[in-house]
Amino acid sequence: MDKDPYIYRVKKVIKVVDGDTIDADIDLGFDISLTKRVRLSGVDTPESRTTDLKEKALGLEVKEWLKKKLQDQTDIIIKTELPDSTEKYGRILGQLFVGDKEVMSVNKKKSVNQQMIDEGYCWVYNGGTKKKDFAELEAKRKSTL
């Protein structure tokens, strides 16, 4: 039997840090919120802060894509597998869903994380060695246009 995920509502996206990380005010209920850094799980995007100019350009592009995706959204949900789903840098690790008024619909919708993969903005990442094949990303993005 699958375990139910933990669902958190985002009151406000404070900042898109890079293509796979945001700062957000998370609604804990009872008019209580907490500002946390959230790392999108299962993805690795090109870095926007690097000396590699090709990677930097791609990193800035995916950061802009994520900003547009989250801009003016009032219904953003973070779905995690554990109640304290944090990674080694203390960031919450989860999937983002936008436009979800009903919490239960997250199980039926495609996450922002998966959209990034499908549109060629990132690599699948589940720990371990990171793969940085920029040609693969560019080819996938061209095929989705």
Language model features: what each stretch is:
Residues M1-L145:
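Small beta-barrel nucleic-acid-binding modules, primarily SNase/OB-fold domains
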